[in-house]
Each structure stands twice: as C-alpha cells, then as structure tokens.
C-alpha cells in the first residue's frame, strides 16, 4: 500500500476551515452529461425532471443502450485525468430498487482503471480501480443507495485517501492503495453501464461530474469543512523529496565517474584516426587513392570519384598519364619523323646497313644515346623479337610485368610479345583508356545478370549474386524454386494449427476444437470453463485451485473432505475456491493470523462488555464464551440485553437496520443469523430472497460472453463472487480473513493476502514515513522510495519501512 498521510487522520488534522461559495475552474471540470450530448447521443435515454431545475436529468431505463463517449470525447476526459491522483466524482441520482448497476466506467480491455458501481442486491457502493502494482482492487462501502430515492454522492480521491459523502454526510473515510491513472490509448468511457452487455444502471442521473482538484465535494456541499493540505499534497511533497534524493545520489555518482575519467584523460591525448591500405591518416586529413578523393571523418574513410580537369598545355607539351596518378598531366614532347614522343620515351632507327641507332626524347629533342650491351639470348633466332624502344632483342614469352607496371587496384598486368599492358578484372570496367584504373560494374542495375524468376539480384565487387525470394529455396546459382515451409517446419503456425503450403508462402488453419487466426490458436470448450478456469485443449478445462469438474463448476469443500485441520479454537470455513480457519465465537486473533488458527485466543466478554447478560444475572467468563449465572437464591428471568434494549427470554426479532437478519434470546444469550431462503415456502421474504421471485426469470450472460446463467445462479470470476438476479450480473470481492500485519503478500493465483515477516517478500506494506533507509552511498531514503544501486545497471533497491530490499532484473541483464 502506498504511504498514507502518516496515520490515516493526519491529513484531516493539519488544517480545517469552512469554505463558502466554492468556485470551480472550468479547465478542471468534466461535465459528463453535457460532453456526451445527451439525449440525442444515445437511443433509449431520455430527459426527465430531476432533483432540481438547474441542470438536465436523464432516465436510464431497463432497455438495451450504448452510452459510450466517442474516442475524441473520451480523450478530452482522459487528458484531464491521466496521471492525476487528486480528483472527485460527483453525481446526483435516483437508482431503482434492487438494481445493481455501474454509474460510470473507465476501462481498457479487461482492466477497470476507474469504475463506480452501486449494488442494490447487496446494498453496497463499490469503487473498482487499478493499483500502482498493476492489480485490480475493489473498495466496498456498505450503503443502501438503490432505494428509489434521490441522493447526492461524492467520492473524493486524494492519492491514498478516500472520502465518501452521501447527501452531504461523510459516510466513509479510508486510507487505501493509491489508484494508477496512467490511462493507455484506447481506453473507453461508459456512462450507466460497464459495456454493451453488463452493468446496466436503472434510474435517473443528474449532475455527473469529474473534478480534477482537491476536495471537489465542496462544490456539491459548500458548507462542508475542507482539509488542508490534502493527502495528495503530502504525497507530492514526499515524492519530491525522494526525487531530490535520487537526483543527489545520481549526480554524486556521475561526478565520481567524471573525476575518474578526467584523471585518465589528463594522462593522454586521444584523436580519431583512419587506416587505409596500411596507412594512418589524422582526423579531417584528405588524400588521393587512385581515382578517388578520400577524407578521414570521425574515424571513418569517406571517398568520392576524382574528377579530372582537361587543361590546355603550353607549347612543346601534351597531356599524358603519369605513374601513380589517375589524371593526365602536361608532359614535354618531342617531334620525330612526324610522330610525337613524351619525355624519356625511346625509339630505335635502323640504318641502311642494318645498324640499330637508339634515340630518347630529352628537352624537346630526340637525342641519340649509346645503346646498351645486349645479353646473350638462349632461344633460336626465329623466337627472337625486336623491340621499338631498345636495340636488344628478347625471346618470345618475355615477362614484361615483372619489370614493373602501372596497373592499379582491380586491374591486372598482361604480357604481349613486345610490351606489358593493363586489363580490368572480370566484373570491372576501365576508368581510362590504358585500363590502369578500373571500377566495379553493377550488373544488377545495368541488366547484365542471369538471375531468373523468384530471385533478387544483389551486386558484389566484380560480380553479383542471385538471392532467393522469401518462400523459395535455391536450385543453382541463378535459379530458385518454391519452398514448402510446411514440410521443412519453417512456418509460424501454432502447434494446434494445420499448415498448408501456397505459392511463395503458407496458410495456417486452427485444428478442430481450436479457434484463432492460425498463428495463434486457443482451445475451445463448448460448455465453457467456469469459476476462472482456462480452456487448454478441445473441451478440456484447467481448473483453478479449489475447483473441479469438467467445466470447473464444482467447488472443492476442503473442510468436509478432510484436507484441512484447523485448531480447536477455530472453524474451517469453506469459501468458493478456497477456505480459511476462522476463530470460533468467543475467540479472536492475537494479530499473528496463523493459517491454521493457532493464533486464536479467548475473548473476555465479561471484562469487555461484549455479553448479553441481563442485570439480574452475573457474567462469568469461560474459554470461548461466557455464562450468565443467576446468583444463589434469586429467580432470574433469562432475559438478554441487545443494543441497550431488554429482550425477553425466548423472544425472536428482526434487526432494525437489516430486515434479513433474525435474532433470538435464549437464557441470556443473543444469537443472530441471516435469514435462510427457502424458495419452496410461499411466505418467503422476496426482499431478502430475490432469487425466489418467480417473476425474475431472466438469464444473465457471463462476462466472457460464452455462458448463460439462470436467475439465482452464482459463480467465481477474477477473485469475485458473481450472482445472476433479475437478469443482472452482480459481482463482489470474495470474503477474505482479516490481515492486520505490517507486511503481507498476495500469492500468485490466489485471491487473499497473507502475512509475511520478511518485508522484502511483501508486496503490500503499511508504510511508515518515519522509518528511513541508508543506501550504499550513505544517502537517506524515505520508505517507499526506489533507486538503482550505485555501480550497477540492473539492481533495483527499495526502502520498505527501514529495510533495504534489492533485486536484479534479469531482462535488464539480457539487454546489456
């Protein structure tokens, strides 16, 4: 439970004062009837006279209707309510006798975030809501609201503090677990019903309002006292302190980490660099790599194609490629016998006598140079080849490439008879005419691939790949055929579905006895599963603990079947789906609440005044009871005293405030019991036993919509006992034994909490804000606060009434 205002009454004692003429800021007010646009909005709801003439009133009759806010209107409501913990529900109503209906409901899927209900069957007002621990909770207020009379009702919620007023009288004030108002998208708002099929309110409603402000009941009853500050104010102050503590702890941790990093940074200078082909480049440094301009940016090499500029060359020069460079540059030239030669280029000329003369281009002139001595060739003369740039011959097959070449990446050197040339590798094209630089050919984009149907072409350096489309498998490098996912078990069908192969995919169909879309199939039970049971296979129900039968329709009586052995001072009480050991009359629990009743101890009725002995007798305490003893020599009447009134011995009467309970006086003892409903008795009181009314034969539809119940039938659903009466479903929380302890836990799949001694195991704690914890960094934490343990990322710690409880989140560890 969230921390209340210290003790439950602390908020009331801080500041009291009358407030007169209380005004309401329109931005904090939701006038539900006006916003919904009744009566034209919903068929079957009509305007009628109300308690007063200041606003419209509407009759909600016993007919099918759908009074639901549009998504746009609902979102206007929720924008004011979302994540608010200080608001008041106001309504003026006149509810039909015995009707059990919902005044309004805010719910999403199966979760009721806020719902106000009035039960005429059990004479209760119920508030259903979601808690901060994401559990459903119902707060029950015994009160007769469905009496066909006008009432003004207000329910003020301030964090964990509830105040219920009826007709400007404070009826109840409680400290409860704080509601969770983080309303998700898709939440719906209903008025006068829970949904299209359940919770129909029958009667008249007027002045239905939601005020997002503290103590909004003042607008309905201006003469009431107002508390200051409210519990929500108090919660806010505590929360702010917790947040500041958490910020302080996180800031301290960050400063410590920053200091450690600064100490390391002082010892070195770090600069991002890039590495390419064994060379290291500094940040923002640029260089040329073949026919690409590259730059080091943030430690990554970024390159783009080099664009060569065609400039005019001066006289006696021309453009020519230079080794190691992509673009042509101006080079000196020589003109010799009508041909152009570049600087350093050689040419042979043979005289008429057959002598070889060697010329070389130098300083714009072809100059004769001495010829080199020629090596002796080891091949026949027929295999000897003359060269244009040397007076020496070579043998056929000479390897010019080993003597050096200018072929770059993606280009290979190839030998001809008299020289070496460059050639682009397969899958690459030349960037210039000498093939020294080459680029990849995108066969996919240019349509130069052989990929067939059912494939996708993917370009690779120097080649391409044919990838099979989804649902197909490979035949060869270029072809794919249909893939039968059903045969290879590569489908997403549910285990309870049949797989049917299709072209390029497959279909899933649920097996007989299951329903769903094929990827998700749920078992179907034709008779349904009652009392919270789950259908796990075709017509097979898995029953919750405490129930049995094909449809979980039978409650297991643990008390009569001998499963339970209660202490001699306790009785075994069988309840739908479970049991508990309850102290016998004359005993009460000592506060330990042991499961078997060992903590029951005797009540001294005589000392506490909880006896019914008349004045002419003497009360004598017994183990588990008392005795009204007549003093020696006196003639005692055997009368009883009940609610300060004398009841004669043998007298039977009906309680004034409960016509369905009968009491009797027997020799000084008063015994009361609930009236037994015998529907065979023609004089049965139909007020107390409405299930015996033959006129009320309407059936009820189960909440799941799969089952129908007759009037008078009962069942269990989500830890609530439900009953069908007059065609209406009325549900109330299962009775739980009192748990008056500091720490309690609600076990999984159970409906009632149990006491535990270890606060770290508890999910509900009576928080005491005076008890604090000291975390690992010596920061003081308030009870209820939580934090991530210093030096970890996945260890969450909480302060629970002075105890530090830490646990590791496995999902967090997986995400690291």
From Swiss-Prot:
Signal sequence bounds: 1-21
SMART domains hit by this protein: EGF (SM00181), EGF_CA (SM00179), LamG (SM00282), TSPN (SM00210), VWC (SM00214), VWC_out (SM00215)
Residue ranges that the Swiss-Prot or TrEMBL entry lists as coiled coil: none
Keyword vocabulary terms for this entry: Calcium, Disulfide bond, EGF-like domain, Glycoprotein, Repeat, Signal
Top-level taxon of the source organism: Eukaryota
Residues carrying sugar: 53, 225, 293, 298, 517, 615, 635
A GO BP annotation: negative regulation of retinal ganglion cell axon guidance
Listed InterPro entries: ConA-like_dom_sf, EGF-like_Ca-bd_dom, EGF-like_dom, EGF-type_Asp/Asn_hydroxyl_site, EGF_Ca-bd_CS, EGF_dom, Growth_fac_rcpt_cys_sf, Laminin_G
Positions of the VWFC domain: 272-331, 638-693, 698-756
One Pfam family hit: VWC
Domain spans labelled EGF-like: 397-439, 440-481, 482-522, 523-553, 555-601, 602-637
Entry protein name: Protein NEL
Organism: Gallus gallus
UniProt lineage: Eukaryota, Metazoa, Chordata, Craniata, Vertebrata
Primary gene name: NEL
């Amino acid at each position: 439970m969230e921390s209340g205002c210290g003790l439950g009454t602390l908020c009331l004692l801080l500041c009291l004062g009358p407030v007169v003429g209380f005004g309401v800021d329109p931005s904090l007010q939701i006038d539900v009837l006006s916003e919904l646009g009744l009566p034209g909005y919903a068929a079957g709801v009509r305007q009628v006279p109300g308690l007063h003439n200041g606003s419209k009133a509407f009759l909600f009759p016993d007919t099918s209707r759908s009074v639901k806010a549009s998504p746009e209107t609902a979102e206007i409501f929720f924008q004011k309510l979302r994540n608010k913990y200080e608001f008041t529900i106001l309504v003026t109503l006149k509810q039909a006798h015995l009707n059990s209906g919902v005044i309004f409901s805010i719910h999403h899927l199966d979760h009721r975030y806020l719902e106000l209900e009035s039960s005429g069957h059990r004479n209760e007002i119920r508030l259903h809501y979601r808690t901060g621990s994401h559990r459903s909770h119902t707060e029950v207020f015994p009160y007769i609201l469905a009496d066909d009379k006008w009432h003004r009702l207000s329910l003020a919620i301030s964090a964990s503090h509830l105040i219920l007023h009826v007709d400007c009288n404070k009826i109840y004030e409680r400290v409860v677990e704080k509601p969770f108002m983080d309303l998700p998208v898709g939440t719906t708002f209903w008025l006068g019903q829970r949904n299209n099929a359940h919770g129909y309110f029958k009667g008249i409603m007027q002045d239905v309002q939601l005020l997002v402000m503290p103590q909004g009941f003042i607008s309905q009853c201006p003469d009431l006292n107002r508390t200051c500050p409210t519990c929500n104010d108090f919660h806010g102050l505590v929360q702010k302190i917790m947040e500041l503590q958490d910020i302080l702890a996180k800031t301290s941790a960050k400063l410590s980490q920053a200091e450690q990093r600064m100490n390391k940074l002082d010892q070195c200078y770090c600069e991002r660099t890039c590495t390419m082909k064994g060379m290291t480049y500094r940040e923002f440094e640029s260089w040329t790599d073949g026919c690409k301009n590259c730059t080091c940016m943030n430690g990554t090499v970024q390159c783009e194609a080099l664009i060569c500029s065609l400039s005019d060359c001066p006289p006696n020069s021309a453009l020519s490629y230079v080794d190691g460079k992509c673009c042509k540059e101006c080079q000196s030239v020589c003109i010799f016998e009508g041909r152009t030669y570049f600087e350093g280029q050689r040419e042979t000329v043979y005289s008429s006598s057959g002598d070889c003369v060697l010329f070389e281009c130098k300083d714009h002139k072809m100059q004769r140079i001495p010829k080199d001595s020629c090596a002796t060739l080891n091949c026949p003369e027929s295999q000897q080849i003359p060269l244009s740039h040397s007076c020496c011959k070579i043998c056929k097959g000479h390897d010019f490439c080993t003597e050096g070449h200018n072929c770059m990446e993606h280009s290979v050197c190839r030998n001809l008879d008299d020289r070496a040339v460059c050639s682009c590798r397969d899958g690459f094209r030349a960037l210039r005419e000498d093939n020294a630089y080459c680029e990849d050919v995108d066969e996919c984009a240019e349509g130069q691939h052989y990929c067939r149907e059912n494939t996708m072409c993917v370009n690779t350096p120097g080649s391409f790949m044919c990838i099979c489309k989804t649902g197909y498998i490979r035949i060869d490098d270029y072809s794919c055929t249909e893939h039968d996912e059903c045969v290879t078990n590569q489908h997403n069908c549910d285990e309870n579905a049949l797989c049917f192969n299709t072209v390029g995919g497959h279909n899933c169909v649920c097996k007989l006895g299951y329903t769903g879309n094929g990827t998700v199939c749920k078992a179907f039970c034709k008779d349904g599963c009652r009392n919270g049971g789950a259908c796990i296979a075709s017509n097979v129900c898995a029953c919750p603990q405490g129930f049995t039968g094909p449809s979980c329709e039978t409650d297991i009586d643990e008390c009569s079947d001998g499963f339970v052995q209660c202490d001699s001072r306790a009785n075994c009480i069988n309840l739908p789906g479970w049991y508990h050991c309850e102290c016998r009359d004359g005993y009460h629990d000592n506060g330990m609440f042991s499961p078997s009743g060992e903590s029951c101890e005797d009540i001294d009725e005589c000392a506490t005044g909880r006896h019914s002995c008349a004045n002419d007798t003497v009360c004598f305490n017994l183990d588990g009871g008392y005795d009204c003893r007549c003093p020696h020599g006196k003639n005692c009447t055997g009368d009883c005293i009940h609610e300060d009134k004398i009841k004669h011995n043998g007298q039977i009467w009906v309680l004034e405030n409960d016509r369905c309970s009968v009491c009797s006086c027997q020799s000084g003892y008063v015994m009361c019991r609930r009236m037994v409903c015998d529907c065979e008795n023609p004089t049965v009181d139909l007020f107390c036993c409405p299930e015996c009314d033959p006129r009320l034969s309407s059936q009820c539809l189960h909440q799941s919509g799969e089952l129908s119940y007759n009037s008078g039938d009962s069942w269990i659903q989500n830890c609530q006992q439900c009953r069908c009466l007059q065609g209406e479903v009325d549900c109330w929380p299962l009775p739980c034994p009192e748990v008056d302890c500091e720490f309690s836990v609600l076990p999984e799949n159970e409906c009632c909490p149990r006491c535990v001694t270890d606060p770290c195991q508890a999910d509900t704690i009576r928080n005491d804000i005076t008890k604090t914890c000291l975390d690992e960094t010596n920061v003081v934490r308030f009870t209820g606060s939580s934090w991530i343990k210093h030096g970890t990322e996945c260890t969450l710690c909480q302060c629970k009434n002075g105890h530090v409880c830490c646990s590791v989140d496995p999902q967090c560890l997986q995400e690291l």
